[in-house]
């Protein structure tokens, strides 16, 4: 935590300029943008509530990613964009889910992962963690469409005990029978 930099810019353009500057400087190894949905374009912030800004967010992301792609490729920086899932209105067939910010991020990214909470972990009546599923949706570096499930314990992170049990089952050292292990 000693080497953690946090920036809370006013607008999306400012956030992406800061990101570009940090990547160019070579001073950071990992840069996380949390979240793409929060990168609100300046014109939208300065406009009135009822104003229509169709495609402004998508244009911002497209311009920024064109610039950032080359910069990131020449640097030794890992850039992570967190995003949210939204539902498309009126979709009858196909997947109604989409991500914010247009298609640029889908196109320019090297790896895309879909991370979802699939259940809760409880100790009696108290929720102590989440069961999580990660699907690799796109991968330019390795085979795509792989999937993994693991437990995230609050205040702890990924459950070491759960991982050891899963590895034991996979290796044949631990036997699983329903919800019981032996």
UniProtKB/Swiss-Prot annotation:
One GO term of the biological process aspect: SOS response
Keywords associated with the record: ATP-binding, Cytoplasm, DNA damage, DNA recombination, DNA repair, DNA-binding, Nucleotide-binding, SOS response
UniProt KW Metal-binding keyword: no
Pfam families with a match to the protein in the record: RecA (PF00154), RecA_C (PF21096)
GO cellular component annotations of the record: cytosol
Source organism superkingdom: Bacteria
Gene Ontology terms, MF aspect: ATP binding; ATP-dependent DNA damage sensor activity; single-stranded DNA binding
InterPro entries: DNA_recomb/repair_RecA, DNA_recomb/repair_RecA_CS, P-loop_NTPase, RecA-like_C, RecA-like_N, RecA_ATP-bd, RecA_C_sf, RecA_monomer-monomer_interface
Record-stated family: Belongs to the RecA family.
Its biological purpose: Can catalyze the hydrolysis of ATP in the presence of single-stranded DNA, the ATP-dependent uptake of single-stranded DNA by duplex DNA, and the ATP-dependent hybridization of homologous single-stranded DNAs. It interacts with LexA causing its activation and leading to its autocatalytic cleavage.
NCBIfam families: tigrfam_recA (TIGR02012)
Record's protein name: Protein RecA
């Amino acid at each position: 935590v000693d080497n953690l930099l946090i920036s809370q810019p006013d607008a999306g353009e400012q956030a992406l300029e800061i990101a570009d500057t940090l990547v160019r400087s070579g001073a950071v190894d990992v840069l996380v943008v949390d979240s793409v949905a929060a990168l609100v374009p300046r014109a939208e912030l300065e406009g009135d509530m009822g104003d229509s800004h169709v495609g402004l967010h998508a244009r911002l992301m497209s311009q920024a990613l064109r610039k950032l792609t080359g910069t990131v490729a020449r640097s030794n920086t890992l850039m992570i964009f967190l995003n949210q899932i939204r539902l498309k209105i009126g979709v009858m067939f196909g997947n109604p889910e989409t991500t914010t910010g247009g298609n640029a991020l889908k196109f320019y990214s090297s790896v895309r992962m879909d991370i979802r909470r699939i259940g809760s972990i409880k100790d009696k009546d108290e929720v102590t963690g989440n069961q999580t599923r990660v699907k690799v949706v796109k991968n330019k570096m390795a085979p795509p469409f792989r999937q993994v499930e693991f437990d995230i314990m609050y205040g702890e992170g990924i459950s070491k005990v759960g991982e050891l049990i899963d590895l034991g089952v996979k290796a044949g050292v631990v036997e699983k029978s329903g919800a019981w292990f032996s």
